[in-house]
């Protein structure tokens, strides 16, 4: 699977000179943005999607099945946060989707437009195993990164 700032425009099969069949993925063009916000990832990802009525699909991806069992809180909180910020500032996000990617070997987080990258510990939450203090830290990380879009990136 390939992820980037924008949604997938199309896919095609390509054959390498050695005869290996591969998949080519083309993404829609990003709106004007700072170059440092460009993000892409390729891997075997699983995901969960937000459960509320926000206008954009919000998905949390991970390289493990943890996204399915532990990504729901982050997906739902991101949708609530973005809904609030869009309403408060009267500026809609200029992308057709918002994904979060939890990475096992990453430290911190980066607010890439359309594809935010997080350390697994900063995005995945299991209500039966994770301390409440980590839920609070996760919430703070998500809210501060999303708020930066209006205070820093626009």
What are these language model-derived features?
Residues 1-140:
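Hydrophobic helix-coil surface modules that form long, contiguous segments used
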Residues 146-154:
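Catalytic Zn2+-binding segment of zinc metalloproteases
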């Amino acid at each position: 699977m390939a992820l980037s700032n924008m949604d997938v425009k199309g896919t095609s099969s390509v054959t390498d000179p050695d005869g290996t069949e591969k998949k080519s993925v083309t993404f829609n063009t990003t709106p004007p943005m700072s170059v440092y916000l460009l993000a892409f990832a390729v891997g075997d990802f699983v995901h969960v999607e937000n459960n509320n009525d926000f206008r954009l699909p919000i998905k949390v991806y991970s390289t493990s099945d943890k996204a399915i069992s532990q990504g729901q809180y982050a997906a739902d909180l991101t949708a609530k946060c973005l809904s609030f910020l869009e309403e408060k500032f009267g500026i809609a996000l200029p992308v057709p989707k918002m994904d979060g990617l939890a990475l096992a070997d990453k430290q911190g987080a980066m607010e890439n437009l359309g594809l935010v990258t997080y350390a697994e510990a900063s995005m995945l939450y299991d209500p039966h195993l994770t301390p409440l203090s980590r839920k609070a830290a996760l919430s703070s990380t998500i809210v501060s990164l999303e708020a930066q879009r209006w205070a820093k990136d626009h």
